[in-house]
């Protein structure tokens, strides 16, 4: 089987064989949110998609370092502060907490989480170096702009002509060209600011990610990701200013996830159809939401509807139900004989596992990979639950474990938390206490013996019983 990983590179718009700058190490930067409002289900898709990509690369033996920034100073934050009359720091802290809570619930792991306001010194240094190399200039207002004409490859990533970029008229007069973009924005009364060689001001949007990505991953790394809406102007401008500074290729693969639509319409405030991620998680649960995000290839739009989430919920429950059968068969132990039909099942399971990896290796195609997992689930219900074959159950268990390592929707099936374990033991001990009060000592003694075999010792007293691990 060919398990070489191929990735669709937005730069060049084609599939390319995956390779890393450093052996067995993947360095990945994904653009995070601007924390001026609740993150929504569109953000959630990006978080989960790149988490699944990271998980699969780890499953394949790579060490992955994933950086995802938090933009905590921006025009939108300042506007929100002025509209509601609250300090911008208060707004940032509140919505950062919501964002981090959503990541935790979705089981999305970020290795480094830099905030823009903690990297102002590095941003100023980055801008100054661009000025020194002739790629940026200081305007009379104290703003600093990137001179797009000094970077000949501008537009390659987004397939956009610089002359067609309409940024509005406010700052056009002080620019060399209308398509130049701000690296540093001069201070206006009532806005937060930091001191710089060019006067009071704050960073532009694009310079933040260039600075923080190179700060933590170096001047050459493997994957730069984000939503498709960031390709232009954000990622185009990031690439221009960074490659202008370092003088060579910056990122190997540009990877972008497609939009979430609501009944075929794009989410927008004007349509009033934006769904906060916290509301979706509250209604559907993080595992169902994760599963639903990954039912579609990350480069294809995914449409949100009640029906789609119900289908995802049912499909995930069927996988979990198959795990109950698998565990039950495994608990019975090996039978020490194998039938021809059992061997056929082994081959089917292994073929589907191989197909799962083939799909995931082909541009992280979670949708196709998922279809092979459901083939294994079908075998569990149609064959394994009747044959009670130990080895078949073990193979199915291992396959679903690898599936979960990527999809992250069944952790409780494979890695029960101590909290859940304690609750189960407490419940058993409480039932045993009630049996003792009913003088059903034979049953209560049997429970004590079985718990002891499992490493849990019951401590009986006159009024009640407690427990401890052996």
From Swiss-Prot:
Its EC number is 6.1.1.16. A motif ('HIGH' region) lies at residues 33-43. It catalyses: tRNA(Cys) + L-cysteine + ATP = L-cysteinyl-tRNA(Cys) + AMP + diphosphate. It holds the Pfam family tRNA-synt_1e. GO terms for cellular component: cytoplasm. The keyword Transmembrane helix does not apply. SMART domains: DALR_2. This is Cysteine--tRNA ligase. The lineage of its organism: Archaea, Thermoproteota, Thermoprotei, Sulfolobales, Sulfolobaceae.
